[in-house]
Amino acid sequence: MKFYKNNIKIDGVADDEELRCAFNNVKVILKRNMIKYQTKYPEEHAEKMRYTFDRFFLDAWHGGCWCGMYWMMYEAFHEMPFKRYAEELCLQYYELINSQSIWHTDIGILFLPMCVPDMRFNRSKEAKEALVLAADCFLTKCAANVQNENSKEFLTDKQVKNPNGKKSGFNDLRKNMGGKISNLNNILILMFAEKITGNRKYTSAGENILYNVLKNNIDNSGRAFFKYSSGKKFDDTSLFDLEAHGGYTRAQAWALWGLSNLYTRLGSEKVYNYFFKCFDYLEKASCGKTVLKYCICGSDGDYDDSTSTAIVLCSILEFIKSLPEESCEYKKLMKGAKRYMSGLLQCAAKPEELTEGLLDRGFILHATHEERGVKTSATVSGDYFYVEALMRCLYNWQPYWD
């Protein structure tokens, strides 16, 4: 495998042929998925690797991931069906944000993978407007608590309702308003909004959010906590005793992804130090696993989490662009990248599984724990970050939030 850094090849663990085979498998599956879904979105979690239609329509953050995969396939293979479907999927979200019918605390990862390629390939005015509206939506509906470190208030039922009087699906903002580690990702959409409008208010808000997330969601050991509220750090699940198992891996993954993207854009020494603090904690606590567990210190037989593995791999591949190849930090991150890519390839769909009759399936196994105990489910977000990792490895790819 070879990684690419500004057209410079970086030695890895396997050859290009293995990665291209995996990438072509993704293309085959996505083409078949297009036959079924066309301009509709699937549920985030598959059941036995099979996706079903989204009961909540578009009120879900993984919509950006689904659309983003189509954009990456178009960029890699220049096949127009991928572009046409991506454009049609984008329009549905543009209409929602224009009518202010979508309020989401993960709005950054929702809109960036769909809007930015639309701007890049089509110079879309609608995409620019949607990005700014999404940033405004985040600031007015979701960011008040994370900008104010002393705020302990949550939205009321009345405020949670959208203009049509309906509650926002599973996006219960009262539950999610506590400072989330994933708000690091929302800073990116604020930076984009300032780039488009020239209005300093967006990055000013982003700076406040960054300060509070670093202060409240990451402890001195480097462990990241999914949420912070009412003066307490806590994780996003009651399924496991996370205190006894080193914490919640997904929170650690989101911390690394947000910090890596912010560092390549800000060059902040503080962000640099926090990234390595979080990375070192994960490496030590996970004991060098090729596929991370749902709990950071999980042992063999516990739930795998290939989605978090893919997010961490993409974080490494983003951060490593800023490091000199001879540095110890570069070598440490590359060692982790090799291990995680090896693990993801083992979780990926195999060519012999790609029969003509198998539509609507995901790409990687063990992407979600699922409360009912399904250990082999795929998720849209896990699939997206797996595709992004392959894209970063095979192409001199410019991320859609650059």
Residue ranges, per PLM feature:
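Glycan-recognition and catalytic cores of secretory/periplasmic carbohydrate-active enzymes
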Residues: 1-402
